[in-house]
């Protein structure tokens, strides 16, 4: 996985409810764990923009509900700082469901995704309509 070019402050923690930004049938996701997170004892795992997370589908089609899947965070409300000094934040927290090869399971992505996510996950960027 490629390093991010921005200083990403983690805006999501374990148990956060986020929207699903693709057309897989899931509408709302709950963060269960964060891949590669090694924290201190009794500290909640935190995820930020471009992190791979394990989620549970809380709202969506009956086939998708209650499934445990992998996802990538594509938008977060907490501002991130880019190397040129600009800060970027989005209106909502959103993720895209991916398979084991980190390809998106949906065919289209709703809303914009961050440039940092596009650099790290090229297949997610190819399905995106707008990159900010």
From Swiss-Prot:
GO terms for biological process: translation. It comes from the Archaea. Transmembrane segments: none annotated. The keyword Zinc does not apply. GO terms for cellular component: cytosolic large ribosomal subunit. GO terms for molecular function: large ribosomal subunit rRNA binding; structural constituent of ribosome. Keywords: Ribonucleoprotein, Ribosomal protein, RNA-binding, rRNA-binding. The L3/L14/L24e cluster may contact the 16S rRNA in 2 intersubunit bridges. Part of the 50S ribosomal subunit. Forms a cluster with proteins L3 and L24e. Belongs to the universal ribosomal protein uL14 family. This is Large ribosomal subunit protein uL14. The lineage of its organism: Archaea, Methanobacteriati, Methanobacteriota, Stenosarchaea group, Halobacteria. The gene is rpl14.
